[in-house]
């Protein structure tokens, strides 16, 4: 899935991490652990294509991330493979209900309304938040917003999950 060759990222002249080489195959898990400021979030932002490496190349499905992002159609396909959840979760749509928030991605993929509804209901049940489906963002607590953000990731059924502290702020339920 991913191959990273001699990846370096610098803030101005300061390297965030040493040159990195790794491969992540389909079905594998990679967990990044380290102190605050050690570059974990930066690394995820690089894999997501939100940051450009100072040096090195990132490959996804044997094609460089640069090539994926050059063409708008390829870029859309790349992001269709990704599920991204960063620590800050206040990304809900303006006045959309939770249900409409969760339906946004599947509708962009042009899934049928039946399939969209099934995916949404499965995610709401899994996360035990069915009671939130008609709520709007300002009515939700921080933990509820986090669960909705996680549901919006799961409903897309991506090939790759990029998670940055996905369970921070959640209760153990």
Pin down the residues of each PLM region.
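Helix-to-loop junction immediately C-terminal to a conserved catalytic motif
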Residues: 48
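Hydrophobic anchor residue at the start of the ABC signature
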Residues: 150
């Amino acid at each position: 899935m991913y191959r990273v060759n001699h990846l370096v990222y610098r803030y101005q002249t300061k390297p965030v991490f040493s040159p990195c080489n790794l491969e992540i195959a389909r079905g594998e898990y990679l967990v990044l652990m380290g102190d605050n400021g050690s570059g974990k979030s930066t690394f995820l932002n690089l894999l997501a294509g939100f940051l450009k490496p100072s040096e090195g190349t990132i490959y996804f499905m044997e094609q460089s991330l640069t090539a994926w992002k050059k063409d708008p159609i390829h870029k859309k396909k790349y992001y269709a493979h990704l599920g991204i959840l960063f620590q800050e979760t206040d990304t809900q749509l303006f006045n959309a209900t939770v249900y409409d928030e969760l339906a946004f991605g599947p509708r962009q993929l042009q899934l049928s309304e039946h399939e969209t509804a099934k995916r949404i209901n499965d995610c709401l049940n899994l996360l035990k938040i069915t009671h939130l489906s008609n709520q709007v963002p300002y009515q939700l607590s921080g933990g509820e917003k986090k669960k909705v953000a996680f549901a919006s990731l799961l409903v897309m059924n991506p090939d790759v999950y990029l998670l940055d502290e996905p369970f921070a702020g959640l209760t153990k339920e």
